[in-house]
UniProtKB/Swiss-Prot annotation:
<comment type="subunit">
    <text>Interacts with CDK5R1 (p35 form). CDK5RAP1, CDK5RAP2 and CDK5RAP3 show competitive binding to CDK5R1. Forms a complex with CDK5R1 and CDK5.</text>
</comment>
<keyword id="KW-0408">Iron</keyword>
<dbReference type="GO" id="GO:0046872">
    <property type="term" value="F:metal ion binding"/>
</dbReference>
<dbReference type="GO" id="GO:0005739">
    <property type="term" value="C:mitochondrion"/>
</dbReference>
<dbReference type="Pfam" id="PF00919">
    <property type="entry name" value="UPF0004"/>
</dbReference>
<feature type="domain" description="MTTase N-terminal">
    <location>
        <begin position="97"/>
        <end position="217"/>
    </location>
</feature>
<feature type="binding site">
    <location>
        <position position="142"/>
    </location>
    <ligand>
        <name>[4Fe-4S] cluster 1</name>
    </ligand>
</feature>
<keyword id="KW-0949">S-adenosyl-L-methionine</keyword>
<keyword id="KW-0411">Iron-sulfur</keyword>
<keyword id="KW-0472">Membrane</keyword>
<protein>
    <recommendedName>
        <fullName>Mitochondrial tRNA methylthiotransferase CDK5RAP1</fullName>
        <ecNumber>2.8.4.3</ecNumber>
    </recommendedName>
</protein>
<dbReference type="InterPro" id="IPR013848">
    <property type="entry name" value="Methylthiotransferase_N"/>
</dbReference>
<dbReference type="GO" id="GO:0045903">
    <property type="term" value="P:positive regulation of translational fidelity"/>
</dbReference>
<feature type="binding site">
    <location>
        <position position="180"/>
    </location>
    <ligand>
        <name>[4Fe-4S] cluster 1</name>
    </ligand>
</feature>
<keyword id="KW-0819">tRNA processing</keyword>
<dbReference type="GO" id="GO:0070131">
    <property type="term" value="P:positive regulation of mitochondrial translation"/>
</dbReference>
<dbReference type="GO" id="GO:0009451">
    <property type="term" value="P:RNA modification"/>
</dbReference>
Amino acid sequence: MHPLQRVFRAQRLSAPLTSMCWVLLRTFRAHNSTSCPDPEGKSSEGVQKDFSSRLATGPTFQHFLRSASVPQEKPSSPEVEDPPPYLSGDELLGRQRKVYLETYGCQMNVNDTEIAWSILQKSGYLRTSNLQEADVILLVTCSIREKAEQTIWNRLHQLKVLKAKRPRSRVPLRIGILGCMAERLKGEILNREKMVDLLAGPDAYRDLPRLLAVVESGQQAANVLLSLDETYADIMPVQTSPSATSAFVSIMRGCDNMCSYCIVPFTRGRERSRPVASILDEVRKLSEQGLKEVTLLGQNVNSFRDNSEVQFSSTGSANLSRGFTTNYKPKQGGLRFSHLLDQVSRIDPEMRIRFTSPHPKDFPDEVLQLIRERHNICKQIHLPAQSGSSRVLEAMRRGYSREAYVALVHHIREAIPGVGLSSDFITGFCGETEDDHLQTVSLLREVQYNTGFLFAYSMRQKTRAYHRLKDDVPEEVKLRRLEELITVFREEASKVNATSVGCTQLVLVEGFSKRSTTDLCGRNDANLKVIFPDAEVEDITDPGLKVRAQPGDYVLVKIISASSQTLKGHILCRTTMKDSSMNCLT
């Protein structure tokens, strides 16, 4: 089954017929008067006439509807798919054109970039890090806040100049928008920026070779339909940084939480999990490549539930944290996150495991027990609070009160002594009063996070807040409150990080410090940056051998100073996770 058949099947289930018509027209009708010379020398008119001829004899609209109504198996890999009837196999090939990828936003977008590149690489495209030599520029975008989108609009204005200066002797420069912004602003992008050739939503990356082939005929092309089952489970992401020591492994996509402020369910679709077997296979391959850290990734990572294996389809139920509720009917059965975390941690004892981003409602004791017991699961938890006011949390539809959140924090710290905590906060949400703000300030002081991500509220269309609430906190008040939260966070983080001074910590070396070529930089268990001098030290596995630590090495570092974001220390020796876990680090 080729990509369009899957696309229309998903559309039949999730959107009105008019949207389907729009995408079909957007994909196949000419919207761009720019000529597109064929690399073999055919005229623009000849290419378009040939394309139109084959399109006329290709599938009809009714053909797509019939195909969409018949359940079909997804192919095991994108290579086995037949080309659409209106395109030849050769037209789906990249012909060694060079692709430049720019990534904005969250770590999911970093992983999406690796998935998109894996697909394009198999179609014959080449990767370039030089913007000037690119034939195709793809921006992997974010829509979580207005500022993120404005960054992309500004970037498009810069690329418009580059496209206009393109020498006629070269193939036309193609520009595409991928990811959440393509999903949210599809119509506006195509109408406002005629220089954008291609749009692909988060669930349409398999379709990139076809979309680029359509673009080569001189048209704009778009596929922004969300899927109910796409997880890219069969695609091995290509690491964009060959020297990296860590990698992100996407275990699920989409989100069902429907928090009132959040655009994610509308840009990334419903929650669906990858089969456990495919995740374990990817982690094994990363281990074989020598990577030393894997972060399991998802919008709501700890609500993972794999129902792909029949024998687990009717067992188990939702196990929410005490005092927490959901905005949706929890799925039943399947292999849960605790099972996945257990299996991943067994693959390579020398590979550190992290996960993000979780929801506080999904922290059963079996997950906490695994974190406590397994030496290679980092003792660090991201616990997004968003606000310290129960009234604001209710308006946000977070499913918990301040009291329930604080109780969970205490429970986690009892279960995992010394655990590092990080969190997200939004200030200036609809209806937030000064008292609500002060309650958030007090929560920051009470919990004392190691790391924090704090933002002023930015209303997003389609969200529940957009339709039912009023963005009534003035911008200057939002910014003032944000500055206050940042100040308090730094004060408290400095205090909690100062307790590490005098301790010896296991650090995974990432490379040289950005500020000094004589210092190395790495991260500890709590995911804090640790800076230490590049010096010869003993290798604990080979006494007497003097070595210099390299990226991917584990070293013991004695902490001598701390700030709100960074620890500094002296390197003691090179070690392994196993050896360090057998010794008490103090």
